[in-house]
Amino acid sequence: MFNFTRQYSVKDGLITDELASHIVENLPARYASAETWKRIYSLQHDGASLQTMYLACEKEKARSGHPKGACILAVRDTDGDVFGVFIPDYLIPAPHYFGSEETFLWKYFPPKKYVHYPFVGNSNFVAYCTKSFLAFGGGNGRYSLWLDGSLEYAYSSRTPAFENNPLSYRGCPDQRIQIVDIELWVLE
């Protein structure tokens, strides 16, 4: 069994021990050894606001004193599927794409199936944070994962950046995904 320290109780959270063990298998070595996974934002506890999530990142960046932070974003849809992204950066609005080849997408759905989509480098569109939306992957006019500013819905399509299938298991490309919960974690 995978062992890591959680700063918050997450028995009602999205990242279970089993899901965490799958994610760790794909993390770069320097992040896989992180001793603490700290949940800094939860839609259920902090409200449905992209700005609140960005503010949590800014506060964590100031607290840690590190210019970069390793983040895991987890999203649950109305079908109960959980999907998200690992990115070795804080999610803070920027006027351009950012991120690195260490970024990856993942999805986890019943019966406990985990799928990993590494960055394949066919575009430089890794992450894009604006005040009105948050997006990962890009190309051909689509995003691998796009979340609206109210965090009520998302879209997921195949892009050259990750060559992923839609992240919502029951979703189709360009179909609106209704969001039930979102969590943002930082690894320390």
UniProtKB/Swiss-Prot annotation:
Keyword hit for Cytoplasm: yes
GO BP terms, alphabetized: meiotic cell cycle; regulation of cellular pH
Places the protein is found: Mitochondrion; Cytoplasm; Nucleus
Cellular-component GO terms for this entry: cytosol; mitochondrion; nucleus; proton-transporting V-type ATPase complex
Any Pfam family: TLD
Predominant cellular place of this UniProt entry's protein: mitochondrion
Family matches, as InterPro entries: TLDc_dom
Domain TLDc: 13-188
PROSITE patterns assigned: TLDC
GO molecular function: ATPase inhibitor activity
Keywords tagged on the record: Cytoplasm, Meiosis, Mitochondrion, Nucleus
Function: May be involved in protection from oxidative damage. Has a role in meiosis.
Entry protein name: Oxidation resistance protein 1
Gene designation per UniProt: oxr1
